[in-house]
Curated annotation (Swiss-Prot):
Keywords: DNA damage, DNA excision, DNA repair, Hydrolase, Lyase
Residue ranges of the region described as Helix-hairpin-helix: 120-184
EC number of the protein: 3.2.2.-, 4.2.99.18
Protein name, UniProt field: N-glycosylase/DNA lyase
Catalysed reaction equations from the record: 2'-deoxyribonucleotide-(2'-deoxyribose 5'-phosphate)-2'-deoxyribonucleotide-DNA = a 3'-end 2'-deoxyribonucleotide-(2,3-dehydro-2,3-deoxyribose 5'-phosphate)-DNA + a 5'-end 5'-phospho-2'-deoxyribonucleoside-DNA + H(+)
Cysteines paired by S-S bonds: none
Record-stated family: Belongs to the archaeal N-glycosylase/DNA lyase (AGOG) family.
Domain notes: Contains two alpha-helical subdomains, with the 8-oxoguanine binding site located in a cleft at their interface. Contains a helix-hairpin-helix (HhH) structural motif and a Gly/Pro-rich sequence followed by a conserved Asp (HhH-GPD motif).
InterPro entries: AGOG, AGOG-like, DNA_glycosylase
GO BP terms in the entry: base-excision repair
Transmembrane feature ranges: none
């Protein structure tokens, strides 16, 4: 565990930021949508889309690109109605459509009250958005969809406000099947607890640690990164037994 803490500390928040912005195809999809959508609606759509990004029928990256292309240049009066048209035709997200539309209906009332300035306020205090979504959606604090939504909101806000704010340390890692599988090789502890400890000891918040692990699981192209960061990620790959 000490070696794991040291390598993540060596990568740091800045290294995680570089991975997010140069390797994560979801980040590229959001940059594309931002260029073709109103900034306020862009962020609201990203929140809504994150809340229905589960039980996919395709790869996550493909789903986010499908979303970005669909809403590019599209005028949206009601997010719920827009998804009522989008999801049934979607290639990468066709399961549990009614349940997903219900989730969007739940959050739309909240989103409709927010201005761009309000959204910027939530970016400055992402913990506040996390707590608000937990209450609105009736979810647990460590719900993987809720914490993933905060992560994608952070991406969207970073793009929209041209400013990087690190994720709060208190928000846990999204505990999906891949994270569970990787963690089980390292510890018997619950993944959210284990990575929270690693985060606190390394100084890198769990949502940023998630950004380091995911590309390694999916054999992402790391060539856009500088050689020093690539070497650190290769070392992390070894430590995770990938």
């Amino acid at each position: 565990m000490r070696e794991l803490v040291e390598i993540i500390k060596g990568i740091g928040i800045e290294g995680a930021k570089e991975v997010e912005e140069k390797v994560d195809r979801q980040f590229y999809a959001l940059q594309y949508l931002f260029r073709h959508q109103d900034p306020e609606m862009f962020i609201k759509l990203v929140i809504a889309n994150s809340l229905v990004s589960y039980q996919l029928t395709g790869r996550g990256e493909d789903w986010w690109w499908e979303f970005a292309r669909y809403f590019s240049g599209r005028e949206v009066d009601s997010i719920w109605k827009a998804y009522g048209e989008f999801l049934p035709k979607s290639k990468n997200n066709r399961r549990l459509i009614e349940a997903k539309l219900n989730r969007i209906r739940k959050v739309e009332g909240f989103l409709s009250t927010l201005t761009l300035k309000d959204l910027e306020g939530y970016y400055k205090n992402m913990k506040m958005l996390w707590k608000a979504l937990i209450k609105i959606m009736g979810s647990r604090e460590d719900s993987k969809t809720i914490v993933f939504t905060v992560k994608m909101f952070g991406y969207a806000s970073r793009i929209a406000f041209s400013r990087f704010i690190p994720y709060p340390m208190e928000i846990p890692i999204p505990e999906d099947l891949r994270i569970k599988s990787v963690t089980s090789k390292l510890t018997q502890e619950k993944p959210t607890k284990f990575w929270m400890k690693i985060g606190q000891e390394s100084g890198v918040p769990p949502l940023h640690i998630d950004s380091l692990i995911w590309p390694l699981l999916g054999n992402a192209d790391l060539t856009p990164l500088d050689i020093e960061l690539r070497n650190k990620l290769m070392k992390l790959t070894e430590l995770l037994g990938l």
